[in-house]
Each structure stands twice: as C-alpha cells, then as structure tokens.
Amino acid sequence: MLTEYGDFKRTKYCGEVSEEDIGKEVKLAGWVHRKRHHGGVIFIDLRDREGIVQVVVEEKTNPEAYEVADKLKSEYVIGVVGKVRKRPEGTENPKLKTGYVEVVADRILVFNTSEALPFPVEEETHVSEETKLKYRYIDLRRESMKNNLIFRHRVYQITRNFFTKEGFIEIETPFLTKSTPEGARDFLVPSRLHPGKFYALPQSPQLFKQILMIAGFDRYFQIVKCFRDEDLRADRQPEFTQIDYEMSFVSEEEVMDVAERLIATLFKELLGVELKTPFERISYREAMEKYGTDKPDRRFGLELIELTDIFKNTAFKVFKSVVEAGGIIKAINFKGSNLSRKEIDELTKFVQSLGAKGLAWIKVEKDKLTSPIVKFFTEEETQKLLERTKAEPGDVILFSADKKEMVYKILGNLRLHLGKKYKLIDESKWDVFWIVDFPLMEWDEEEERFVSLHHPFTMPREENIPKLKEALEEEDLEKKKEIVHSVRARAYDMVLNGEEIGGGSIRIHRRDIQEVVFKLLGIGEVEAQEKFGFLLEALKYGAPPHGGLAFGLDRVVALMLGLDSIRDTIAFPKTQRGICPLTGAPDYVDPKQLKELHIKVLE
C-alpha cells in the first residue's frame, strides 16, 4: 500500500486551492484530517500547513482510488492527483477558505501510515499540558498552534526589516561566555579542555552589545536566545528570546522612539491596530503609589488610595503601630461590589498567601458602616476616610497597613486579582506606556546591601552622579540609604496591558562611574576585576555614550495573540519545572562523558 515519494511533485498547498483552479489538475500532499463515507463516495479532508481542502473519491468512476481511500485512517500521509471542481450547490463550507471547491481524485498515493493518536488534532483537546508537550509534533498540527508559530515568524520578518531600514547591523554574540551572575543563576557548561573551568550561557547579550558600541558599531540589533536558571514562576521559560538593540550617541528619547515605532509597526502590520505614538510616560513612583506595581494594568480602575495622614493619630492600634514604625496605610475602594462576608473571607485568604497578616475592610451601607474596625475610628477619621475614598452605599473599602513595600505587594496583587475575578478588565483595549524615573538602586533587607533595579551598567541621571560619590563616602547607613534612594536611573520599561514587554537604559560609558556603582553594590575591586574586568578594560579606550533596550519576544507575541501562556508561542517549550517532556531533558549522561569533563556527581 505504501508508495515512495519518488517523482511525485506537489503543485499547490491544500489551503491554497481556489475557484481560480477549477478545471485544472493539482497535485496535493498532506495528512488525512477526516474521512467520511457517503454511499459509494468517500470524502477526505486533506490538511497541510496552509489549511484543509475536500477531496472526493467516487467508486463508480475511479474504483482503484476508491479502494486506496477506503483503507485510509486519520493522519495517514498521502498524495492526491485530481481535478478541481466547484462544490455542488448547498454543500459549500464558508468556514473554510477552500469551502467553495473540491478536488476529485484520480490517484491517491500513501506515503506513510499513522497509529492511533494519543489525542485528536482538534482545537478542543482535553489532555494535560504534559501530554501535549510530550507529543508536541501532534499538538503543533492544530490550526491555532500552527498559526501562532507563523505569526511569530512574521514578527521576526517585520523586526529584521524594520531594523535594517533604520540602519542597524545584525550581529551575533557568543553563547559560550563568562559567568557574571546578577540576579538569576547562570546555566553552566563545563570545559573539557580546561578542567575545573566553566562557560556560562548568557542571560542577555548586555556586555557584548556594549563592547560592540565601543568597537564603533553604533547601531546593533539581534534576535537572540537568552538563558536563566531560575525557579520558574507562572509563565517563564529557562530559555527565551529577546529582540535586542543598542545605539551610540543617543539620549533616552531616541532609544525609546525606535522601540515605539517598532511596536507600532508590528501592531499595524499584524493586527491592523494603530497605536498612537509617542506612548504615555508615567514615573515609577506614580505607578507604585497608584497601582502598587511598576507594570500596572490600567484597563480598569481600583487605584490605591493614600490614607496614612488620616490615621496618623488614630486610636486603632494596628494602624497606629504601623504609622509609628514608618509604614503606610492605603486602601482600595471596590465600588458597588456589595461583597458578601464569604467573598471577603476568600480575599483575606488571598492576601494572607502573599504575607499579609489579614485584611481590614469596611462595607458601606445606606445608613451604616459594617466593619470590625470602624468602632475604633473617631467621627472625623471616618468622615475623612469616606470623603477620600469617595465612598457610597454598596462600596467595600479594603485596607493594607504595613511597610511600604508590603502594602504595594498586597494591594497591587489584590487589585489585579479583583480585576480578573470580577471581570473588570477591558480586554478590547491596548494600553501601552512607559515607566520612567526609576531609582538606580534599592536596599535589600535580606542581603543587607544595595541592589540594582535594572542592572549595574545603568547610567544615573547626570545631576545625580555627584550623589554616588557622596554616598560612597557616607558612613551612616541610614543617611547613605537616603542619598542612594534619591538617585534616579536613566532607565525605561515598556508596559503593555499590565505586562512588562521591554526594558532598557542609557549605559555607563565612563570607567570611573562604573567603579563607583560597583562599590555601592558591594562589588569590591577584586570581584569587579574577576567578573567584569574585560568591560572595565574596554571602558578605558574611548567608549561612546550609548543605550539600548531588549523586548521579550515570546511575551510580545503572546500578548498580541491574546494567549494565556508564552508556551503557546514557542515550538518546543519546557514545563514549569524546566523539563522537556518530548526529549526527556534534562537527563543523566554517560559516566565516560563526566570523566572527560573532570566532573563527579555527588549523591
């Protein structure tokens, strides 16, 4: 029954057969999507990359082809030679782009058979994610998955064309490089030729693209794989793709302008959506104070309301102790929600899972306020609270009182949870904007040191540079924190519908400033030389002012397609545990290989 492909030459994709082909012979190849018997006639839905076309096999006119068709099963790989005709009236299928024509088979060739599939090639498949990834080659046969990857390919095409027209040069940077972990862990690759030494897979091409600027390639771009060995949160991958670019002799505005025009081009060409440029800019401080996060979803309300000043002298001990300890009090007014006690209890459990001690609340009713805490407030405090929150009957006010960082974490997450749970988000909207005016560093209580908000190569604002040296000389830790926290970075993040899709900065191009920043971050001279000596050396030889940005391509594609997970934009992704069910990676290796690498696995 099986035929070698031999001289068979496909003339058209199944999904491209049209009314223009009526009366013509076509040669098609693909998979049997579906087969139906209808009294001496067999109908085959033949599927390939471009779509499905109906093939008709008539026993009366072509018994040989009919005999072959009769033995076909789902997902057999076949070739069809036949003539295109118009479908009989009343049998058209407007859901298919080929739905007004069909191919009458003269000959059917079977190139390969298929066993019964672990799950059908249908859009609605009730199988686990693990099973889909194990049989990814079957999952990718589904229309939606195929379209996702074709869409991603178009993003690549448009991006490359855009940067080429803008005068950028595409340059590849190494995958085997030096370990310079900042934040996430590096994936390490042992060197056989240099026992005990390791390469690292890059978390980003950051240092190489800066060195390319020093080399004089003033406009570089790359679509590049990056790697992070981190605990995978909800929607992360250990290997991911960035659209990366860097420019010399530019300000923030010029780098941001390129980013805006790229995103606007992608939206216009792929979705037919006109994004208004320049995008709005909001400060880091405003984002945190209003939304509790530096990547807010602004497609719904529920902004955070500042209440610390109202309760600074309150008799309510919980609030009073927070204010005395330098904390803050904020609230969300969930307008018209009329939350039940059960719903409030569920929200309390949610915030407790984030580290909150509990959830204070007030239910505003027509003639009274229902709450376990309102009895502790003075009449003046209650009145000011109702005015500040613009409270009306039916509203429920939800409070958080703690250290500033914890309040932002609790209410920022609670706001998003309410938005999703109660369907407050306008899904038809595209809200894209910049977050700017980031602090350069913040104090990490656990590590007891300053950490970069972006990375250690971000340039501070020019007027803030003297403060870095001042902070370095300051011995009092609290004063040092105050000085450092007042330093603003020349950094910018692009946010789309509550997701950070890109981030960048103007970089440090002066060795003296870079050394001061390293010292403030607790990276001493010896460590700086060990990790970043090649960069410090390069900065001595005429480094131009430069800056750039990187977009998370997987995330951009997922958001544009309205997908819940970036996994659906990647051909062969890993699970949340960093496993590839298709290949079984990561896996044990032959002891001989380990011996060659001078590695011993300890139990």
From Swiss-Prot:
Record localization: Cytoplasm
Reactions accelerated catalytically: tRNA(Asx) + L-aspartate + ATP = L-aspartyl-tRNA(Asx) + AMP + diphosphate
Swiss-Prot/TrEMBL keywords: Aminoacyl-tRNA synthetase, ATP-binding, Cytoplasm, Ligase, Nucleotide-binding, Protein biosynthesis
Site (Important for tRNA non-discrimination): H38, G90
PROSITE patterns: AA_TRNA_LIGASE_II (PS50862)
GO biological process: one example: aspartyl-tRNA aminoacylation
Stretches for region Aspartate: 206-209
GO molecular function: aspartate-tRNA ligase activity; aspartate-tRNA(Asn) ligase activity; ATP binding; nucleic acid binding
Predominant cellular place of this UniProt entry's protein: cytoplasm
Residues where ATP binds: R228, D229, E230, Q237, E500, G552, L553, D554, R555
Pfam families found in the cross-reference section: GAD (PF02938), tRNA-synt_2 (PF00152), tRNA_anti-codon (PF01336)
Role noted for this protein: Aspartyl-tRNA synthetase with relaxed tRNA specificity since it is able to aspartylate not only its cognate tRNA(Asp) but also tRNA(Asn). Reaction proceeds in two steps: L-aspartate is first activated by ATP to form Asp-AMP and then transferred to the acceptor end of tRNA(Asp/Asn).
Family from the record: Belongs to the class-II aminoacyl-tRNA synthetase family. Type 1 subfamily.
PANTHER family for this protein: ASPARTATE--TRNA LIGASE, MITOCHONDRIAL, ASPARTYL/LYSYL-TRNA SYNTHETASE
Subunit structure, interactors included: Homodimer.
Name listed for the protein in its UniProt record: Aspartate--tRNA(Asp/Asn) ligase
